Amino acid sequence: MEIRKIVFILVITLFLVWPPFLRAQVPPSFENPPVITEAEAQRFIDEYVDKYTKMDIGDFMVLFSKGAIENRMLTYADIRELYQMTFDNSEYLKYGLEISTIQIYKEGAAVMGRYEVIQALKRSPYKKVYKGNIQWELIREDGILRIKEINYGRDYRWDSPLHPYP
């Protein structure tokens, strides 16, 4: 009986002190870096504002994925048509933006903030003012950052959106 106890203790001791390198090893998990950095997302949004105010539809639409959606319903073709109309009817556009959040995900980024667009209409002394919340979902396609989805709303006020600015 005494020998069994000694053998049992010896076997347990061997298992506990057995060199760790002989045990089964699991490779360490390496997390993939995000496909978009916060700085890249910020630069992209700055480029978006710049191209919007230059009103060149070709340059501007390069920022959108061909599968892009606007306000949960407009397709790429609809988006292009909408912005083309806006650019065609504008003498100039001013775009103010305050980014509140940039969230980085494995597959992209979400950028949220508030915008204010002042649209000087062609052949009119009036300017339209639009403002509200905005959100972009960004992805990387073929190595290029693009808009997957853009959603925005408008703050409605009791006064008219047409303002005679000097």
Predicted regions located by residue number:
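Bacterial N-terminal signal peptides that target proteins for export
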Residues: M1-L10
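Short, low-complexity N-terminal intrinsically disordered segments enriched in polar/charged residues
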Residues: L22-I57, V62, K66
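A short gly/proline-enriched turn/hairpin at secondary-structure junctions
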Residues: L63-Y76
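Short beta-strand edge/turn micro-motifs at domain boundaries
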Residues: Q25-F30, P34, A110, V129-P166
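Bacterial N-terminal signal peptides
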Residues: I9-W18
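Surface-exposed, charged secondary-structure patches
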Residues: Q84-Y126
